[in-house]
Amino acid sequence: MFLFLFFLVAILPVNTEGGEIIWGTESKPHSRPYMAFIKFYDSNSEPHHCGGFLVAKDIVMTAAHCNGRNIKVTLGAHNIKKQENTQVISVVKAKPHENYDRDSHFNDIMLLKLERKAQLNGVVKTIALPRSQDWVKPGQVCTVAGWGRLANCTSSNTLQEVNLEVQKGQKCQDMSEDYNDSIQLCVGNPSEGKATGKGDSGGPFVCDGVAQGIVSYRLCTGTLPRVFTRISSFIPWIQKTMKVLQQS
């Protein structure tokens, strides 16, 4: 899930993660009622999961790379292994951005149309989206939550969260020529070592109660910062796509 990365790179193999990470803090139960747990299957019928967030009663936003078959969304969850008063709803239409690029991770955003409208209550609520002119600035500290993987390679049963600092785009550009600050966010202060982990993809980066980013990917070095999708750059696409999905 949320990882504190220690400086052991010099003494560990490149792909080793187990000895260098511990995870973040458990969220207060149901304190993030917009969160969605998304389960789906790949072409080999292997199960996967991502995070997402409710942006309308019948629409969940997530990352485009979280697309698959037989997608189901669980709303109102805290511990996904316990019996809770959740709403499990099938997805009838997944609409990833038509220009999503698996290699560069550009346009890593997707909307899911739910089979039925969610019942909003104390543990299930929508979250606000930014205006197209909103711009998250370097130095701003916002929060990510998710059910991502822990240090022992198991996924977290309970929702975890961490505060992460927005970095200057140049930090990510120096590490990857594919980074594009106009549509992406560079997130995570290397000196603090806090980060998202596998399984947190698709979750929201929340600043002052507004979903400003989507957890997208980590750079090829495996180190901080991470790259998130910048939601404000996609508002026209979101509005158009939501209208089409809700009319279908």
From Swiss-Prot:
One record GO biological process: proteolysis
One Gene Ontology CC term in the entry: extracellular space
Location in or out of the cell: Secreted; Cytoplasmic granule
Glycan attachment sites: N67, N152, N180
Disulfide bonds: C50-C66, C142-C207, C172-C186
Annotated signal sequence range: 1-18
CDD domains: Tryp_SPc
Pfam families: Trypsin
Transmembrane helix recorded as keyword: no
Main subcellular location: secreted
Propiece residues: 19-20
Domain of life: Eukaryota
Molecular-function GO terms, alphabetical: serine-type endopeptidase activity
UniProt domain Peptidase S1: residue ranges: 21-243
Reported tissue expression: Mast cells.
Keyword rRNA-binding set for record: no
InterPro entries the record matches: Peptidase_S1_PA, Peptidase_S1_PA_chymotrypsin, Peptidase_S1A, Trypsin_dom, TRYPSIN_HIS, TRYPSIN_SER
Keywords: Disulfide bond, Glycoprotein, Hydrolase, Protease, Secreted, Serine protease, Signal, Zymogen
Catalytic residues, chain numbering: H65 (charge relay system), D108 (charge relay system), S201 (charge relay system)
Family per similarity comment: Belongs to the peptidase S1 family. Granzyme subfamily.
Protein's name according to its UniProt entry: Mast cell protease 8
Species of origin: Rattus norvegicus (Rat)
